């Protein structure tokens, strides 16, 4: 939040790519309005959340039920080290857990999405370096309650997946600021 405040107070736009609430609070919206500066971003969804955002709609579209989704990441870079601390992991965990709730809506399909188990873990593993490995175990059920499983092993680099999004947002927020647009 300090960086967002400092940027806006100095008359500079602010872009956030991490899954936290830095720009999701009324005080930041008010400051952006007051300083006539644009703010953007929340979660670039470059790893496991990207997988969930892509695969959960398949489950919903096919009206498959969900019994559980277990996700774990191993990271070897500074992100992994920081997120290995429970206090630092909490915001990321909330973001990752809310992804399924926003796609597989229990009120719309209570028999399929009301009572599933969802667990998210991030582990620091220095040999992995800047690479990230995400493992997802998804327990689903189909017609007549027939149980099935999906296993996903996603090896990626956050920096490679995030860089194009970051560059696009920087260009867009610069264009917005030059055009006199501000706020969220």
Where are these regions (language model features)?
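Conserved active-site and cofactor/substrate-binding residues in soluble primary-metabolism enzymes
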Residues: 2, 23, 49, 53, ...
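C-terminal active-site/capping subdomain that shapes the small-molecule cofactor and substrate pocket
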Residues: 141-184
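Generic secondary-structure signature for well-ordered alpha-helical cores
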Residues: 33, 37, 56-64, 145, ...
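Glycine-rich beta-alpha junction loops
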Residues: 45-47, 70-77, 131, 142-146, ...
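Charge-patterned, long linear interaction tracts outside catalytic cores
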Residues: 94-156
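Conserved anion/nucleotide-ligand pocket segment
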Residues: 40-42, 46-115
